[in-house]
Amino acid sequence: MILQTGQRTDIPAFYGQWLINRIREGFVDVRNPYNPLQVTRYPINQEVVDGIAFCTKNPLPFIPLLNEIVDYRQYWHMTITPYGTDIEPYVPTYASVIEGFKHISKQLNSQSMVWRYDPIILTNEYTVDFHCESFYKMAQALKGYTDTVVVSFLDIFDKVVQNFPEGYRPSLDIQTKIIKEFVSIAHSNHMNLKTCGEGVIFKELGADTEGCLTLDCYESAWNIKLKAPKRAPARPECNCYLHGDIGAYDSCSHFCRYCYANTNRAVVRYNRLHHDPNSSLLIGRLSKREIIKESTEKSWIINETVTQDSLF
C-alpha cells in the first residue's frame, strides 16, 4: 500500500516527530472523519508499505528526520506559490521552501519530486502577469530538481467560501491564457505540466490531464509495477489514486485562506492542543469507546525492478 500523509493536513510541517514515532511503533490509527469512534489501524512496515506520499508547503522541519525513513520509497508533492501573508499567513518564504525542495530532491531523484503551483488565485495584486513572472522564476530555480509541475485554479468548496469569500475562479479565457504560458515555461525547463482536478479542457494546450497522483506516477518514480485495489475517484474530474491517508482535518496551522481542510482557526488550535506526538492518533488519544478495525492491506508491488536511489 501507499501511505498517504497529505490529503487532510501538513504532516512534515507540523507533525513530523509523530510520524517518525508511528513508523518506529509499526502502526498508525486513523479516525474516520465522519464517524470519530470508528478507527482504522494501518501497519507500517516495509512488507506492507510500498512507499510514503507527502504533500507539504513546508518540508524544512522534517528534513532533520529524513534519515528515519531512508528505507522507504518516497513521493513528494511540494506546494510553492508566490502569495504573501494575506493569503498564506504562516507559510515560509518560497525561496526557503525551494531550498528544502532541492535538498530532498538531491537525496532521492527528480522523478520523486513534484512542484505544485496551486491554486492559481487572481486579485488586483496577483495578476496574470504576476503569476507568469513568478512561475518563470520558480521554474528556473527548480530546473533539474523535478520533472513535473502541477497547477490548478481555485476550487470553491464550502470551507473556502467561509474563509475566503472574495476568492473566485477566473473565466475560461483567462485560464486558457495562463495554462498556455505555463506549459511553455514548464517545457522550457524540462518539466511536464499537469493539471489537478480540471478535467481534460487543457489537454489541447499541451497539459497532461491524466492525474497528478496516479499509480503511474509512483511506478515511474520508483521503477516498480503496482496492482492496487480498485477505488472510486474522489471527484469525477480526478484520476488520482487516493487511499490510506493518516492525517486529520482541522489540524493545519498554515491557515491558508483557500484551504478546504480547515473549518476555522479556533477549531485547528483546539485540535493542536490535543496533539500528542506519542499517541497512535494524530489528534487525541484512544479511549475505551473506539472500535478499531485492523487494516488488511498488503504490498501492491507485483514486479520490482529497481529500488529508489538514496544518498543518505
Give each language-model segment a name.
Residues 1-87, 94-97, 101-110, 265-312:
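Conserved Radical SAM active-site core
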Residues 8-10, 57, 79-83, 118-122, ...:
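Active-site beta-loop-alpha junctions enriched in small/polar residues
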Residues 83-91, 119-129, 163-171:
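Surface-exposed cleft-lining segments at the edges of enzyme active sites
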Residues 160-165, 169-244:
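A conserved mid-domain beta-alpha-beta active-site/ligand-binding segment of alpha/beta enzyme cores
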Residues 236, 244-264:
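Local cysteine-cluster metal-coordination motifs and their immediate loop/turn environment
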